[in-house]
């Protein structure tokens, strides 16, 4: 498990006995959350920028941390970063590497920010990005359905009510019902 500078695990500074292998496997999320590396780095850069603007860290420290974070992002993007399960999650893997690159100044990334803040920030940044991708896909689907509807204004199809035959309808009208549903879905994402 990850240890702090006093060589104690992050999760158990009051626990003298080490965690079991099973607990370590259950507690490690790096296999899942390593895909959040861009969000984690972006959140840390934004945080250190805020600390600089609030005059909590110097220009030199800010730049040193940003340099280290950018280097880590390149390493991960180029598949030269070795994720380690013993560091539990994406945050600790990045933090450990940042300490290796820039030294003790890496500790400033936690000034005025808890690990829970870091986790939720990463997740919100990821959700925003994923939502944007969904909206782009919905726009493409809507566009294609509208084009198909325009070609089928005079195409008649059987209508159904509760899976029983109902009044005949235009295929275009039927398709436009889906366009409205997708517009509703899009509103829910924004």
Segments from the language model and where they lie:
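A helix-coil-helix interface module used to build multimeric assemblies
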Residues: 2-190
């Amino acid at each position: 498990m990850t240890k702090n500078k006093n060589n104690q695990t992050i999760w158990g500074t009051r626990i003298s006995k080490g965690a079991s292998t099973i607990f370590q496997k259950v507690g490690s999320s790096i296999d899942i959350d390593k895909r959040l590396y861009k969000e984690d780095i972006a959140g840390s850069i934004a945080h250190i920028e805020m600390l600089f603007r609030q005059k909590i860290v110097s220009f030199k420290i800010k730049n040193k941390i940003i340099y280290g974070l950018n280097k880590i992002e390149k390493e991960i993007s180029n598949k030269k970063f070795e994720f380690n399960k013993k560091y539990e999650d994406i945050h600790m893997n990045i933090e450990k590497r940042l300490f290796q690159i820039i030294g003790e100044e890496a500790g400033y990334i936690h000034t005025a920010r808890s690990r829970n803040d870091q986790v939720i920030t990463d997740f919100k940044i990821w959700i925003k990005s994923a939502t944007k991708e969904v909206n782009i896909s919905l726009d493409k689907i809507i566009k294609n359905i509208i084009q198909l509807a325009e070609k089928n204004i005079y195409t008649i199809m059987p209508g159904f009510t509760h899976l029983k035959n109902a009044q005949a309808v235009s295929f275009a009208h039927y398709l436009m019902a889906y366009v409205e549903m997708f517009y509703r879905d899009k509103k829910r994402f924004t």
